[in-house]
Regions:
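Short, well-structured N-terminal submotif of metal-dependent ribonuclease cores
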Residues: 1-46, 61-71
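Acidic, PIN/NYN-like endoribonuclease modules and their adjacent C-terminal/linker elements
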Residues: 1-7, 110-138
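Histidine- and aromatic-rich ligand-binding microenvironments
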Residues: 11, 45-47, 102-103, 124-125, ...
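Alpha-helix capping/helix-boundary segments
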Residues: 14-15, 50, 89, 109, ...
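Residues that scaffold the ATP/ADP-binding catalytic core of kinase and kinase-like folds
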Residues: 17-19, 57, 131
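Acidic catalytic patch
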Residues: 22, 45-49, 70-98
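Short active-site oxyanion
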Residues: 40-44, 81, 115-119
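Short hydrophobic/aromatic patches on beta-strands that form ligand-binding or substrate-lining surfaces
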Residues: 54
Length: 138
């Protein structure tokens, strides 16, 4: 019996080409891939470091508003072929990122702590209290 295909990892630059479309040849290839991911014929694992790099690049370099960034990424995370151990955590973090002024990494940490019933060490009382995360100072 053949082994099921494992999801493949994707780099930030592929997702950027898909969202921004500033390199026509690469955009065409990235779009083709993402269409397969959308219909589930291809599976991708999008790690949190890639999401963080995407957000930073879209905010700082392309000056995309955070709500637009979150919406675009949440759309990608709704594709049938997006798989991975942290997909749920990242999706929750993106919703928090969209609705607050808290940076994505803190939203991700809060989402992970909440989903995995963990206590988070931080000096950032304000943000983690707003995200309703169990946290404590070291």
């Amino acid at each position: 019996m053949p082994q099921p295909k494992k999801p493949r990892l994707v780099d930030t630059n592929v997702l950027l080409r898909y969202l921004v479309g500033d390199e026509p040849r690469q955009t065409e290839r990235a779009t083709s891939l993402m269409e397969r991911v959308e219909d589930g014929s291809e599976e991708l694992d999008i790690p949190p470091v890639v999401v963080a790099e995407m957000i930073w690049t879209l905010e700082k370099f392309y000056e995309v508003p955070r709500r637009d960034i979150a919406q675009k990424l949440m759309t990608i995370f709704s594709f049938k072929g997006v798989r991975g151990p942290e997909t749920s955590i990242i999706s929750t973090a993106l919703r928090s990122y969209a609705s607050t002024k808290i940076d994505f990494v803190d939203c991700y940490l809060a989402s992970r702590a909440n989903e995995q019933n963990m206590v988070l060490y931080s000096f950032d009382k304000k943000d983690f209290s707003r995200l309703k995360t169990r946290w404590q100072s070291p």
